């Protein structure tokens, strides 16, 4: 049983989610871990309907990140609040039909796969803009879509080190120190 205050909070939160400034937008979320889910969480918080697409059996890597509450990752739940979710294998023709139906109604697609992955499945920028010309296509990758490092995976700590940020944190005469939060992912997610 919820207290009066808890009921008021639920009503307030539901109102905010339903009537935010992005309430008429549909976002397709093909993201995982932090940068993409953070971006789409903000869009959801602002009222957009967000449908998160996850690979069968694997899902978002962050489902395995602790701490856990009743077997669910608190990290995953916090970044994916307010979103709908469906499991689709984008290599499977039946699942592609479902995905295409979702895309046909969508306003925005957000993805953070390694460059070239969606192209292999027929959903790269060139394919999408021909089939869905009004769709906004947002892509985040650690080292960009072009250039010599595009194939490398990027985690925030690696980018902090490569960018020199770790050399100016921590104590004098100590090892390079990671900033306490994943500042690169969070900033890019904005």
Each model region followed by its residue ranges:
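Single conserved hydrophobic/aromatic residue that forms the stacking wall/gate
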Residues: 1-13
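N-terminal helix-loop segment corresponding to the beta1-alpha1 unit
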Residues: 15-190
């Amino acid at each position: 049983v919820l207290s009066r205050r808890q009921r008021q909070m639920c009503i307030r939160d539901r109102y905010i989610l339903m009537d935010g400034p992005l309430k008429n937008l549909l976002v397709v979320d093909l993201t995982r871990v932090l940068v993409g889910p953070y971006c789409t969480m903000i869009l959801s918080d602002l009222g957009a309907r967000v449908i998160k697409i996850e690979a069968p059996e694997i899902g978002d890597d962050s489902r395995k990140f602790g701490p856990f509450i009743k077997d669910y990752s608190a990290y995953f739940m916090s970044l994916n609040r307010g979103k709908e979710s469906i499991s689709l294998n984008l290599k499977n023709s039946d699942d592609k039909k479902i995905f295409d139906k979702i895309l046909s109604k969508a306003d925005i697609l957000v993805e953070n796969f390694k460059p070239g992955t969606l192209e292999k499945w027929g959903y790269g920028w060139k394919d999408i803009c021909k089939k869905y010309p009004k769709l906004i296509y947002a892509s985040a990758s650690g080292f960009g879509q072009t250039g010599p490092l595009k194939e490398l995976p990027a985690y925030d700590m690696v980018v902090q080190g490569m960018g020199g940020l770790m050399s100016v944190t921590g104590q004098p005469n100590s090892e390079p120190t990671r900033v306490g939060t994943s500042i690169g992912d969070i900033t890019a997610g904005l």
